[in-house]
């Protein structure tokens, strides 16, 4: 199977970036092309790492430099347009994919020609991949994905593999919505006639830390979330009760201290895990 990886790069520790790339090079079915979007100028250390891989793996890496920082959604669209294959796997530059992740996703696309997007569960870790602190569980079947998407993202963004042309056919792909590009795209897709599913396995290890909670409780983040769900309500994807729920929880999140947010996030929004299964 010929397939792509689409990565967006701005700020990252070089070591994390290397771990992420290596996890994709170890896939049981190798990618045909890895597209790295440089979203604005990078540090010399990161440039060095990217150049090393581009020289080492001739023809595998395609580097897309953007003159200025466009933000996640628009940068990913640029990368998507440059991908030469129809099937594209998303990956964050500090996360680790398990070796069979893409093979299992490719099998689903072979089984079901109408499938447009396939995600997986994630395990979140602190410091080392062995230190799993939580998992984010999402629904498996299309109809449950549509329902779940009324309030929350029904896919784990860093795990998805999708059909490039289906994404771009859905109102031009990613939109420029601050930190909520994933839920915005996915809910538009599954409500717009594109078929989705999630695999019932954690196939990506996601790096987490206290900064993630600080970002989630920023007013810009809360406002953006409310705006996206308001748009879903106007479109008829979400109900009024969903919008009210999101407004109350996002304002609560903004007001709540970080320690409380961390407890709620792990107990309610995610399932807590202490060891890797």
Locate the predicted segments by residue.
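Short, well-formed alpha-helical segments that are part of the catalytic scaffolds
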Residues: 4-26
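Short aromatic/hydrophobic "clamp" motif used to bind/position activated sugar donors
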Residues: 88
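Acidic donor-binding loop at a coil-to-helix junction in glycosyltransferase catalytic cores
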Residues: 178-185
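Acidic donor-binding segment of Leloir-type glycosyltransferases
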Residues: 21-65
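Short, flexible, basic/aromatic active-site loop/helix in glycosyltransferases
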Residues: 120-121, 135-153
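Catalytic core of nucleotide-sugar-dependent glycosyltransferases
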Residues: 202, 206, 214-238
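Glycine-rich, basic loop-to-helix element that forms the pyrophosphate-binding segment
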Residues: 66-83, 104
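Conserved donor NDP-sugar-binding/catalytic core segment of glycosyltransferases
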Residues: 100-133
């Amino acid at each position: 199977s010929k397939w792509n990886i689409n990565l967006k790069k701005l700020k990252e520790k070089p070591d994390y970036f290397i771990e992420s790339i290596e996890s994709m090079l170890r896939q049981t079915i190798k990618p045909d092309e890895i597209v790295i979007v440089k979203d604005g100028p990078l540090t010399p250390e990161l440039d060095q790492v990217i150049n090393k891989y581009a020289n080492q793996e001739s023809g595998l890496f395609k580097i897309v430099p953007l003159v200025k920082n466009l933000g996640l959604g628009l940068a990913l669209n640029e990368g998507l347009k440059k991908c030469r294959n129809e099937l594209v796997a998303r990956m964050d530059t500090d996360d680790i994919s398990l070796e069979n992740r893409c093979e299992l996703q490719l099998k689903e696309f072979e089984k079901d020609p109408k499938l447009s997007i396939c995600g997986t569960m994630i395990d979140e870790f602190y410091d080392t991949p062995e230190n799993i602190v939580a998992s984010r569980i999402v629904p498996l079947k299309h109809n449950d994905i549509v329902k779940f998407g009324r309030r929350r993202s029904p896919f784990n963004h860093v795990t998805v593999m999708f059909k490039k042309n289906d994404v771009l056919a859905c109102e031009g792909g990613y939109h420029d919505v601050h930190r909520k590009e994933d839920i915005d795209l996915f809910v538009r897709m599954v409500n717009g006639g594109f078929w989705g599913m999630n695999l019932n396995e954690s196939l990506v290890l996601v790096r987490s830390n206290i900064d993630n909670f600080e970002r989630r409780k920023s007013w810009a983040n809360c406002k953006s979330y409310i705006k996206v769900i308001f748009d879903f309500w106007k479109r008829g994807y979400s109900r009024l009760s969903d919008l009210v729920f999101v407004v109350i929880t996002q304002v609560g999140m903004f007001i709540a201290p970080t320690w409380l947010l961390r407890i709620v996030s792990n107990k309610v929004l995610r399932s807590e895990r202490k060891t890797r299964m």
